[in-house]
């Protein structure tokens, strides 16, 4: 094996280890949120708001249905439900404002256009970014999307957005 191939292989191993460690850290944060809320099941807006303020303080704007989204400033975040304010609620996703971009996290790993094709925040023209992996952290039978979303936001503030995009 030539030196270049070994260097490439070593770099791939380091990246794999980094991703593995990030996922472990993320899961640990989600478990902490579950302990704080006292369960690992479906969450309502009040529970998520209380936990979001507890962990993230003023950086956490709140919990909203998709038709009532506020403006976010740089380094602020929120959790939104895919349903409108007139519906019961179906699935929570997280939004983080990074400069001129909104970063969207979906625990099912779907492309944002497929779950929320008309997502608009404030007419600011900010770019919408999702994780390029489209990998799911939540299994179909699990109902903890709110905790996963909050866990991802906590991870963003603890480890940085670049690491969070690898989850």
Predicted regions: what is each one?
Residues 2, 11, 17-93, 98-102:
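Cysteine protease catalytic domains with a Cys-His-Asp triad
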Residues 74-156:
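Cysteine protease-like catalytic core of ubiquitin/ubiquitin-like
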Residues 152-167:
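Contiguous terminal or domain-adjacent regions
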């Amino acid at each position: 094996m030539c030196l270049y191939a070994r260097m490439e292989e070593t770099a791939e191993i380091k990246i794999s280890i980094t991703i593995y460690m990030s996922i472990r850290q993320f899961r640990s944060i989600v478990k902490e949120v579950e302990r704080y809320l006292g369960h690992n099941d479906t969450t309502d807006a009040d529970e998520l708001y209380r936990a979001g303020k507890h962990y993230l303080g003023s950086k956490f704007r709140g919990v909203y249905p998709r038709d009532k989204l506020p403006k976010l400033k740089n380094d602020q975040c929120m959790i939104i439900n895919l349903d409108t304010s007139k519906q019961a609620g179906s699935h929570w996703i997280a939004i983080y404002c990074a400069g001129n971009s909104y970063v969207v996290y979906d625990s099912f790993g779907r492309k944002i256009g497929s779950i929320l094709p008309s997502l608009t925040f404030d007419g600011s023209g900010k770019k919408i970014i999702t994780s390029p992996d489209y990998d799911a952290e939540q299994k179909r039978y699990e109902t903890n999307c709110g905790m996963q979303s909050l866990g991802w936001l906590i991870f963003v503030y603890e480890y940085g957005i670049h690491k969070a995009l690898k989850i």
